[in-house]
Design a protein with these regions (language model features):
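A cross-kingdom feature that marks ATP-driven nucleic-acid transaction machinery
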Residues: 43-53, 57-188
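Conserved helicase/translocase motor-coupling segment
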Residues: 1-47
Length: 188
């Protein structure tokens, strides 16, 4: 057993070997690595959520055999906390984790916007298949889906996987980059 499982969880288990945030989290796997019960991990994560350190997104799933269902993505409300934990406070030109930083920033800003405007009917998810097809962030409101793909480079365009289009009829889709994020993230 580790002396401070929560600190170990934050510093070593939520991050991959390359020091970038491990978005996809399995409580069972973390519990095994930390040699604690899975409920301990869940309580630690809940405590960090209750103190506005991080938050989770659940997977969107229509019970298709190809969709990941029990995995969650974990994001930090404040990217500065993430940077301190991985001991990397360098400016962007000296970093290799632009994509993960950008995704965390965009998802957290969108979630803050939705909470501030009390838009509770909107539910937030991510989507992923076992064959690694993924959508970074999805909002569902009264049966309508809006999918977001976050790209650091304005030259790159995201694309909706055909599996998603087939399963979730007529979704709206937008690629968010540094040039358009204000127009996209801060609107209803």
């Amino acid at each position: 057993m580790f002396p401070h499982p929560m600190l170990y969880l934050l510093k070593h288990q939520l991050f991959q070997k390359d020091r970038s945030l491990l978005f996809f989290v399995s409580f069972t796997e973390l519990a095994g690595k930390l040699q604690v019960d899975q409920t301990v991990i869940q309580r630690y994560i809940k405590l960090l959520e209750d103190n506005f350190i991080l938050f989770r997104l659940q997977a969107l799933r229509k019970n298709l055999r190809t969709e990941v269902g029990k995995t969650r993505k974990i994001y930090f409300w404040d990217i500065g906390i993430r940077n301190i934990l991985i001991q990397n406070t360098n400016t962007l030109e000296y970093r290799d984790d632009h994509g993960k930083l950008w995704e965390n920033f965009c998802v957290s800003e969108r979630m803050k916007y939705l909470r501030y405007h009390n838009l509770q009917p909107i539910q937030s998810f991510f989507w992923r298949t076992y064959s690694q097809k993924e959508i970074d962030y999805i909002e569902e409101n009264q049966g309508l889906y809006r999918a977001f793909e976050f790209k650091w480079s304005p030259k790159k365009q995201g694309k909706l996987p055909a599996d998603f289009i087939d399963a979730y009829s007529n979704p709206e889709f937008v690629t968010v980059n540094p040039e358009n994020f204000g127009e996209v993230l801060y609107q209803i």
